[in-house]
């Protein structure tokens, strides 16, 4: 487009017009003035130049836009509605190649600039090093200048001393000259006796004449002496300077030696500190190892104590179950006539739910009995309803929800419908010298043994052995003082989430003191039956059956057992050591003397936790 408007300005000039053509508003036209023609011509030329410049700028912008559009079309080809790609002519490909060439050239220039930048960085580093070296040289130069100034000051002092000595020498020489001049006599005229005068002059004026006429030997000797004296002073000053240099060298050597000793001392000190730190680290490791060994020994001892406690608990549970089964058989034999009267048809259906499994055999292990949903020992509900499931009961107001496996051993709480069992065979009481294994296991320990166990051991199950209580009397076995303790699971496995609900589980949250109530005695009492001589022992066994029995060590690991460590609970427990009946000092709940101390302390801990003490 620039070529189109390149020479169009010639149409406004006179040369572009033909010889026969004349401007309408030219200067030769008499109808228009000269000033007006020139002004209009200049305005037209200016406007045409502006228009041409604008058109050139627009053309350049259009070319740039076309070039960019071509680049975009090459990068992102357009697809028509018919699915065909838009074809580009050959000049567009040429423009792309030109762009590639420009890109390569720009990349080369960029690499060149980067190379120059790297060179500039290296030069800057070299310049920095040179500046540092120059600074070091400047520092050394300043040091040398200071040393030179000191030497100059020293030389000036020596020169001043030499000048002073020379002045003193000149003064002394002047004084000597004055003394010699005062000693010489004035001139005397000639006399008749010239020989005497000559002789006198020879005798008295010899030195003066010699001093005045020519330099005598005295002046020469004085100058020699002064020179020698000055040389000696100069040599002495040089010797002092050499001595000062030697002392300086000696002091420098001493300083270097002291610096070496200081470095050696620092190294030895660092080595000593490192060795001390290593020794301290080894001592700390040894101390930690000893602590771990002591902790492992204490853990082992505590595990053994807990194992012995669980073995004792399982032994007591087996003894209690065997005792309860014996008492149940005896009670069933005593109540058999009444059950035969009230249940003539023994094959009638039982009112209890048929989905209950049969009771477990008495010879099962403690673990199996704990897992069984129907425990062989009677619960408090079974004591309230001792009717056997195999016989129909005409009084259905007190039915047991779970069919018990044995009759309740309490004679004061007998059901009006006893089971079909043979006649009771009363057993005579045992002699006082013979003691059952249950009485030995639940005998009350002496108070001093219990206190010694609390003070000397971390595990409070030391006195749970049955042999330690063999000499104690079962004074706590009283029917009026029987209570039901709060059952607690050992390790969370006694009543797991997968175990079925048992009568003992139903009575977990109920604290019940089984005392004689008038309504119950009127309802359940049977005046025809004589009181059993073994009432206290049976009541003790049924009462102890409500306590949780810890599992054996083989059943669960020690990690599930919680050890009581609360000292307030221990102090509260120590208050009940000397009493006849072990009871909780907070809720007055009675416990057997042989009940584990750890479980009792945990019971007190539950009160303290609930009250947030």
Swiss-Prot record:
Residues of the region (Interaction with TBK1 and IKBKE) are 281-330
Coiled-coil stretches: 48-162, 218-277
User: Where is Zn(2+) annotated to bind?
Assistant: 584, 587, 603, 607
Query: Residue ranges of region Disordered?
Result: 328-457
Ordered alphabetically, the record's keywords are: Coiled coil, Immunity, Innate immunity, Metal-binding, Phosphoprotein, Zinc, Zinc-finger
The Low complexity compositionally biased stretches are: 362-372
Instruction: Kindly list the ranges of residues that form UBZ1-type zinc fingers according to the record.
Output: 581-607
Q: Is Zinc included in the keywords of this UniProt record?
A: yes
Q: Which GO terms describe its cellular component?
A: cytoplasm
Q: For the region Homodimerization, what residue ranges are annotated?
A: 1-280
InterPro entries in UniProt: CALCOCO1/2_Zn_UBZ1, TBD, TBK1-IKBKE_adapters
Q: Where is the composition biased (Pro residues)?
A: 346-361, 389-406, 416-433
Example of a GO biological process term: innate immune response
* The protein's role, per its UniProt record: Adapter protein which constitutively binds TBK1 and IKBKE playing a role in antiviral innate immunity. Essential for the efficient induction of IRF-dependent transcription following infection with Sendai virus.
Assembly and oligomerization: Homodimer. May form a heterodimer with NAP1. Interacts with TKB1 and IKBKE. Weakly interacts with DDX3X.
Question: Could you tell me what this protein is called?
Answer: TANK-binding kinase 1-binding protein 1
* Biological source species: Rattus norvegicus
Gene this protein is translated from:
Tbkbp1
